[in-house]
């Protein structure tokens, strides 16, 4: 894709500011009022600190996808993710994180860059994300990958697809086991042994099993090493056959937590799901 002309870039910047302002109510709901990018001149939206490459990608792809959508709520969701992405990019740059220079933002003859393709995919997922609490975390994906040259673009697409496929409650479960409350989990396991309980039933049980199937949640072995569900004798029939204190994120699970900033999920949301897990 060719370079933007000054007039085109300015027009897109105005459109980006407008669409973010049109999404302000939803931005406040899912980001807690932490996003502050709509002020100032339209041409400077995102700020120089956000990085030229990522700002151009967000501006160009964001406006294009937004204008394709006909449903107002879908447009608001896309505007919210764009605001989050710009804010995260600016914060990372302010922290001194360097934008990757391995070709992630480079387009070829008749081909878009990996960054543009990934952002379009994330925005189209966001447009249909009826669990709108996920939007803050979908918006984190591009800025995270922009500073992670250790993650190949193909892996980035896989992570984005996983984030789209998971439910909000699965996001929260991953956040819990990013820093598991081991004492509470141990007490739960003792109670289950005494009472002969089987843990929660219904949807939550299935969602946790699915995290194991996806390779995001695993179990520790006798050496304390984390492996996939099925790698130990007691996990052969599924993760619920293993004491909860031994549940751990796999390498892939930790990667998704980092890229989608799931560690930012509130204590209130974690406690609610954790209480259901411990029931």
Predicted regions and their residues:
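Short amphipathic alpha-helical segments, especially helix-boundary/capping motifs
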Residues: 5-8, 115-117, 147-151
């Amino acid at each position: 894709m060719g370079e933007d002309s000054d007039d085109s870039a300015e027009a897109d910047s105005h459109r980006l500011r407008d669409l973010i302002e049109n999404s302000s109510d939803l931005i406040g709901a899912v980001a807690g009022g932490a996003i502050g990018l709509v002020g100032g001149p339209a041409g400077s939206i995102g700020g120089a600190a956000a990085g030229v490459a990522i700002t151009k990608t967000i501006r160009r792809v964001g406006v294009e996808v937004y204008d394709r959508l006909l449903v107002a709520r879908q447009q608001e969701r896309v505007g919210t993710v764009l605001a989050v992405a710009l804010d995260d990019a600016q914060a990372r740059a302010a922290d001194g994180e360097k934008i990757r220079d391995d070709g992630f933002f480079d387009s070829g003859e008749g081909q878009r860059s990996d960054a543009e393709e990934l952002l379009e995919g994330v925005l189209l997922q966001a447009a249909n994300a009826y669990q709108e609490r996920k939007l803050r975390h979908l918006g984190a994906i591009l800025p995270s990958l922009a500073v992670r040259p250790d993650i190949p673009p193909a892996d980035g697409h896989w992570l984005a697809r996983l984030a789209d496929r998971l439910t909000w409650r699965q996001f929260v479960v991953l956040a819990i086991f990013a820093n598991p409350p081991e004492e509470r989990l141990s007490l739960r396991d003792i109670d289950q042994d005494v009472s002969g309980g089987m843990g929660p039933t219904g949807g939550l049980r299935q969602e946790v099993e699915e995290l194991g199937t996806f390779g995001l949640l695993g179990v520790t072995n006798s050496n304390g090493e984390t492996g996939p569900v099925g790698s130990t004798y007691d996990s052969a029939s599924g993760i619920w056959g293993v004491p909860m204190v031994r549940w751990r994120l796999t390498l892939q699970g930790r990667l998704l937590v980092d890229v989608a900033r799931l560690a930012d999920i509130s204590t209130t949301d974690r406690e609610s799901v954790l209480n259901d897990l411990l029931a």
